[in-house]
C-alpha cells in the first residue's frame, strides 16, 4: 500500500551556499589542502573568490530543487521493497582486508519476515538544468559552474536534513 507523498523543495542559491562542502569542491579542481604550498594556496584562494562571485551571479536566476519521499519499506534478502515495489541491490563487491562482511543497503532496513514495516527516505537534488549549459564557449567558467552545481545539489541535501 502506497501512502507516500512526494515533497518538492526549492531553494535559492544563497540559501544553500553556506552548506557547500568546499573540500570536495577543491578536490574536483585538483587542490589538496597543504599549507606548505603557498603558490597552490594562492591559486585556491583565487578560485574560491571566483566561485563565490559565480554563486552571486547564479543566485539571480537559478535555484536548487529537491524531491523526496518517505516510503514504507522492508528488506527481503538483498532487495528493498519500497511502497510495494521491489528494488534489487548489490552487496559490496571488494573484499575487506579485515574480513568484515559484505554489506548491502538492505542490511539496514527491517526484514519483511518481521511483519513490521520500516521507513526509508529517498531523494534527488539538482540545480536548474540550464545551469549546465552556461558558458558553452568558456571552458573555465563552464567547469566552474558545473562544479558549483554539483556542490549546490549536495548542499541542498544538507539543508533539507535540518
What are these regions (language model features)?
Residues 1-143, 147:
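Active-site loops and adjacent core secondary-structure elements that bind or stabilize anionic groups
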